[in-house]
Amino acid sequence: MATEIFSDVVKSVWSHATAKHAHLRMAVQVDNRSRLLSDLVYQLEKRLSEETHLDDETLAIYESQTALLEDHMALVRKCAAQLDNSNTIDHRTPLDAECVFLFEMICPGVRYGKTLNSLWTKYVVQWPEKLIRQELDMVKPLSFKDEVAKYMEKMQEKTRKNRMTQKVINEMRIAHQKGWFFVFDTLTLADDRLQAFNENPNALRDYFRTVGRAVLRAEGRSVKDSYNDCYRYLCVPEFGGQHGRLHWHVVHMVRTLPLGSHDPNFGRKVRNYRQINSFRGMWPYGFTQPIAVRYQHDAYSRKGWLWPVDKTGKAMQSKPYQAVAWYVTKYVAKQSDQRQKAITERQKKCKNPLMAICLKKEFRVRSSRKLGMELPSMAHLSNKVLLELSRISFDSSPLYQIVKENAKKQLTLNIGALPLHVILDVRPEVRSMLKTIRRLMKKTPEFNWQSSIASMTVTLKNGDISDEARQYIIDAGITPTDLRAKATQTFGGK
């Protein structure tokens, strides 16, 4: 690998690599913790030298704080000495007796694994920077949230929304290709079940387990099996516009419908029913409305279900699956916008005290594990092509964020066999985007948000990537042409 490309690869996947490879993560954390402790020792000595009156109590506090720092520094130094820079970054270091002794002295009663990496992870969790500063009475003051910080929060929220939207579209694309069934449901909360819902923090988790096990039974499998290969879901919370009442929109994607599922329009003169009764009764806290999602070439048509009609008796307009996917993502965008609203605004609209308790909680978008992250393997691609895919933009693929994440994961695996010192030699400087933008605002009279952020990130247009990278996107079926269709109608109703 060329030196320039290798440096760019490490810079591109640095955050992924430190999260994936235990040896590299520990080396970085040991270095950061060593710098932190040295800085705290300096601050402690400076504070002591500035004391005008030293009584016995002050000296005792100083001695205990100094002893605490010495214990932590001894553990950090010993762990640093055990790191083998010649070993690969995915290597796991065996335990050392002295490290174990120091760890048990600092973290008594805390269990740890069979490697030094697991012991170090437990130490960092038990003693974060905030706790050490609290013990030394050196807590950092809360930073003021200025215009830059508020703008960065909005940008992060927008990025999360776009990422979830792309994951939903990709998951539904994969489920359609596999011939799965789509069910759109709305979960509500009944007044007489609000107390039971408030008392059960795992109500939603239990509901999705119930549906997953129903699918397993329909396939003749044990309910103890994992249902990730036959059932996927997305759940988006929403607050009603009129009264602020909490409810959820759910998309079920199942390989096999639960037992008892049948065409609701079979034998009817007017085929205007779409509810699937086999999904009802699984949510014990209110009402549900599970609706079969119908579109062109769906699994229901292959199963022989009749095509439904609308309220006027006309056959429903046939849309491609992409339209359904884009329609579902509007709920994700809407929920993201609603997070900006204050909880008090929701509570003002709500007259039920039990519902007001629900509104105090923070409900997030829930989904199956690794929802929408599946793409064709990138193991055969070169590091140069992977680096290009990790920098693509929307005009190359509407699922550009998923492509970028998968490319970075593959690059992270590719560099896993390299020695630690080779990676650390090209370690990138981690800069704070917040501080960088603040500095640019002071230097630039006419500051532009978008151009400044764009200049800090490397992105490639469709014409800038190689033919091999472009061919991968085409073969994966995720080009803008493949995902062009958008929804123009509502897929709800009976």
UniProtKB/Swiss-Prot annotation:
Among the GO molecular function terms of this UniProt record, one is: DNA binding
Question: Does this entry carry the keyword Isomerase?
Answer: no
Q: Outline what the protein does.
A: The A protein is a specific endonuclease that cleaves the viral strand of supertwisted, closed circular DNA at a unique site in the A gene. The A protein also causes relaxation of supertwisted DNA and forms a complex with viral DNA that has a discontinuity in gene A of the viral strand.
GO biological process assignments: DNA replication; viral DNA genome replication
Keyword terms, alphabetized: DNA replication, DNA-binding, Endonuclease, Hydrolase, Metal-binding, Nuclease, Viral DNA replication, Zinc, Zinc-finger
Give the transmembrane region(s). none
A Pfam family of this chain: Phage_GPA
Protein name per its UniProtKB record: A protein
The gene designation is A
Catalytic residues? 327 (o-(5'-phospho-dna)-tyrosine intermediate), 331 (o-(5'-phospho-dna)-tyrosine intermediate)
User: Highest taxon of the source?
Assistant: Viruses
Per UniProt, the unnamed Zn-finger stretches lie at: 230-252
